[in-house]
Amino acid sequence: MRVHVADHPLITHKLSVLRNKETPAPTFRALTEELVTLLAYEATRAVRVEPVEIETPVTSTRGVTISEPRPLVVPILRAGLGMLEGMVSLMPTAEVGFLGMARNEETFEPTTYAERLPMDLSERQCFVLDPMLATGGSLGAAIDFLFKRNAVDVTAICILAAPEGLAALEKATEGRDVTIVLGALDERLNENGYIVPGLGDAGDRLYGTV
């Protein structure tokens, strides 16, 4: 498993505003979209392309286009939905699937309650959107779900991660082609399974339920 922590002052600035408990939901949503676009730029460095002939106003030349089959973007519901627009604005030709997962707040174990994905992901590059990599359970289960449908490589984009979640995810994805792109790696998890210092519950803050 490869881990890349994006190092950019704009990412750090936007993340600082997201962490602020006084940031209202509309601002939180807008900044999340902007931040994800920056992370997506890093995450798509290895996206597959193929050569194409194009005509400029001056002459013929060769360029590239994103290869078929199209990459698949998979937000983990519900908080991952807040990251979707930032991703597809950068890669609008990508296909979008959905995976609904929830964390049991007592056991911290993930459960799948919904999915809308192609049955066969052979030769597909998949990009999973999950803002908070806390225990690693939900993201690990989502990645396993994709590989069971024959995905060839998976990149997860997370705004924040805890070391415990990364360690659990590395164990769960051993031997698989997985890359994790992070906005920041935080200190630890608290006794409730939340990232510290973190930014709270991303889903609640995105949708104004706190």
Curated annotation (Swiss-Prot):
Its EC number is 2.4.2.9. The keyword Transcription regulation does not apply. SUPFAM superfamilies: PRTase-like. Uracil binds at residues 195, 200-202. Keywords: Allosteric enzyme, Glycosyltransferase, GTP-binding, Magnesium, Nucleotide-binding, Transferase. Pathway: Pyrimidine metabolism; UMP biosynthesis via salvage pathway; UMP from uracil: step 1/1. Its cofactor is Mg(2+). It comes from the Bacteria. Binds 1 Mg(2+) ion per subunit. The magnesium is bound as Mg-PRPP. One of its GO terms (biological process) is UMP salvage. 5-phospho-alpha-D-ribose 1-diphosphate binds at residues 78, 103, 130-138, 201. InterPro entries: PRibTrfase_dom, PRTase-like, Upp_B, UPRTase/APRTase, Ura_phspho_trans. One of its GO terms (molecular function) is uracil phosphoribosyltransferase activity. Allosterically activated by GTP. It catalyses: UMP + diphosphate = 5-phospho-alpha-D-ribose 1-diphosphate + uracil. Belongs to the UPRTase family. Catalyzes the conversion of uracil and 5-phospho-alpha-D-ribose 1-diphosphate (PRPP) to UMP and diphosphate. This is Uracil phosphoribosyltransferase. It comes from Leifsonia xyli subsp. xyli (strain CTCB07). The gene is upp.
